[in-house]
């Protein structure tokens, strides 16, 4: 048999050319230790800060992910997002090459999700078309637009004294059980029909409390435009820490497309505690109150993402699909104080980051003044420019009346005989205080709130018994709705009052007062 070298070379050549060799390069490491939801990994060379790491799946096949937070010389410290009991020393960990992402878009509206955007309400999967990273840089100064549109909460005391604008960060601060969540939920309920999408982030709360909030939103018909992100007290510290950023990314979807969104963080004190726990377990050096050194940055980078962005930003982001529209993300962070101490570390941090605060007091709450807002130290630094003309013109004297009333009431306890002017001021203050009371889940429209403020401003309530003030108010609302619907519609549409409307409203309130017994 004759061997032909040329033939053999040709055969080898064709075999080499037809070889389909593929190599899969993976960056992987080994678990060195696992404890308290913290995993130390050796051998991950090209891992990014905040990168998602893939761990062995659970027994039922659910993928397990972690977040790379500590990048050290010879190891990586990672927090596990979810269950970690099945992870053992020696397990293989793979880099994903991706920063943590959550699903975004209108598909999430009406759903309850966890910190990773996975549904937990038993209503089936969420088929979101888009996803985005949870950590994003806030819009720059040039991309922003000044806050000049109101975000009505429907609460008389807030909309008149501490108005909130679209794109503002307004802190709600107070001790436990002072009605902080109630104020935020009322603000969400009042956005019905106003084209504002809402995100409610529950951090470290009892599952029963979250369930009650969802039920309240459903009963008010507010779940249709709301996403609830729940990281309950039973979940890991890592999930509680991440949840606020996940919710913010979901809210930014609407802001970046020329829409308005409202996000409530309930509450950031628990997020700071969760972050402190994660940091201490990662052996980062503790600082004041055992919080890590970057706890200010934890909240500032989150709250700076709430902003009003200009038309150019929206146009550039949507590549020209949306033109001539501004977008906004309004944040209502909640902070819980201990015994009214607003000078503690986390409260002072968040007060300095936000554009104002609504301070709720236990003493006022227990006295039946609800919402229990302390008008003296509650401020809105930018909301005044966004207040509607109608409310702005009518609410000018309310804060002054209340401040003077509180001061005089303290002196009046010791004085036996008071002059006429002082007595008048005390009577007026008592009526204004009574008038600012409002039951939960009953937000007011701009026109009805305007009518109430008009009645108290023009002295129509000066001779009404203090105990009957709220009855007078509800009776007036019903009277105006029934007999002066065109006037109320005009006030609602214009958000301002001309001389004709003022004359008509004066006549209407006078007529109602005669019929009020």
Curated annotation (Swiss-Prot):
Topological relation to the membrane, as annotated: Peripheral membrane protein
Record's subcellular location: Cell inner membrane
Pfam hit, one: ATP-synt_ab
Gene3D superfamilies (alphabetical): 2.40.30.20, ATP synthase alpha/beta chain, C-terminal domain, P-loop containing nucleotide triphosphate hydrolases
Quaternary assembly: F-type ATPases have 2 components, CF(1) - the catalytic core - and CF(0) - the membrane proton channel. CF(1) has five subunits: alpha(3), beta(3), gamma(1), delta(1), epsilon(1). CF(0) has three main subunits: a(1), b(2) and c(9-12). The alpha and beta chains form an alternating ring which encloses part of the gamma chain. CF(1) is attached to CF(0) by a central stalk formed by the gamma and epsilon chains, while a peripheral stalk is formed by the delta and b chains.
GO annotations of cellular component type: plasma membrane; proton-transporting ATP synthase complex
Record key words, sorted: ATP synthesis, ATP-binding, Cell inner membrane, Cell membrane, CF(1), Hydrogen ion transport, Ion transport, Membrane, Nucleotide-binding, Translocase, Transport
PANTHER family for this protein: ATP SYNTHASE SUBUNIT ALPHA, MITOCHONDRIAL
Enzyme class, spelled out: translocase
Site location (Required for activity): 378
Function recorded in the entry: Produces ATP from ADP in the presence of a proton gradient across the membrane. The alpha chain is a regulatory subunit.
One GO molecular-function entry: ADP binding
Signal peptide: none
EC id: 7.1.2.2
Catalytic activity, as annotated: ATP + H2O + 4 H(+)(in) = ADP + phosphate + 5 H(+)(out)
Protein name: ATP synthase subunit alpha 1
Family per similarity comment: Belongs to the ATPase alpha/beta chains family.
């Amino acid at each position: 048999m004759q061997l032909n070298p040329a033939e053999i070379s040709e055969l080898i050549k064709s075999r080499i050319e037809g070889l389909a060799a593929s190599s899969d390069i993976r960056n992987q490491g080994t678990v060195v230790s696992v404890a308290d939801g913290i995993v130390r990994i050796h051998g991950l060379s090209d891992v990014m800060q905040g990168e998602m790491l893939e761990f062995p799946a659970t027994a039922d096949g659910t993928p397990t992910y972690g977040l790379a937070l500590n990048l050290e010389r010879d190891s990586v410290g990672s927090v596990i997002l979810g269950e970690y009991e099945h992870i053992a020393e020696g397990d293989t960990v793979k880099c994903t090459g991706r920063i943590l992402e959550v699903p975004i878009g209108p598909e999430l509206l009406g759903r309850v999700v966890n910190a990773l955007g996975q549904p937990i309400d038993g209503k089936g999967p969420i088929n979101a078309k888009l996803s985005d990273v949870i950590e994003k840089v806030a819009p720059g100064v040039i991309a922003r637009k000044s806050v000049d549109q109101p975000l009505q909460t429907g609460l008389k005391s807030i909309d008149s004294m501490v108005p909130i604008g679209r794109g503002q960060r307004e802190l709600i601060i107070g001790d436990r059980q002072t009605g902080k969540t109630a104020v935020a939920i009322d603000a969400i309920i009042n956005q019905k029909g106003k084209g504002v999408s809402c995100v409610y982030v529950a951090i470290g709360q009892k599952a029963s409390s979250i369930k009650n909030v969802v039920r309240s939103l459903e009963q008010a018909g507010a779940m249709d435009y709301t996403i609830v992100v729940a990281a309950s007290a039973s979940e890991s510290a890592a999930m509680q820490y991440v949840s606020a950023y996940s919710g913010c990314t979901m809210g930014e979807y609407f802001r970046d497309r020329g829409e308005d969104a409202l996000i409530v963080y309930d509450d950031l004190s628990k997020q700071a505690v969760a972050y402190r726990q994660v940091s201490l377990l990662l052996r980062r050096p503790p600082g004041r109150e055992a919080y890590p050194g970057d706890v200010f940055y934890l909240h500032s980078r989150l709250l700076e993402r709430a902003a009003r962005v200009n038309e150019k930003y929206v146009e550039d982001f949507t590549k020209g699909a949306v033109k001539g529209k501004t977008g906004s993300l309004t944040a209502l962070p909640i902070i819980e104080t201990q015994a009214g101490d607003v000078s503690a570390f986390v409260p002072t941090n968040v007060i300095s980051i936000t554009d104002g605060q609504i301070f709720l007091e236990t003493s006022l709450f227990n006295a039946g003044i609800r919402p229990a807002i302390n008008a003296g130290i509650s401020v809105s630094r930018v909301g005044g420019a966004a207040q509607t003309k109608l409310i702005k013109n009518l609410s000018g004297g309310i804060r002054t009346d209340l401040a003077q009333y509180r001061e005089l009431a303290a002196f009046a306890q010791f004085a036996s005989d008071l002059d006429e002017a002082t007595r008048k001021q005390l009577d007026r203050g008592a009526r204004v205080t009574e008038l600012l009371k409002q039951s939960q889940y009953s937000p007011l429209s701009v026109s009805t709130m305007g009518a109430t403020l008009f009645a108290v401003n023009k002295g129509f309530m000066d001779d009404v018994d203090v105990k009957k003030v709220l009855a007078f108010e509800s009776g007036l609302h019903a009277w105006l709705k029934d007999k002066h619907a065109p006037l109320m519609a005009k006030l609602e549409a214009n958000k301002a009052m001309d001389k004709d409307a003022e004359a008509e409203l004066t006549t209407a309130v006078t007529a109602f007062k005669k019929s009020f017994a």
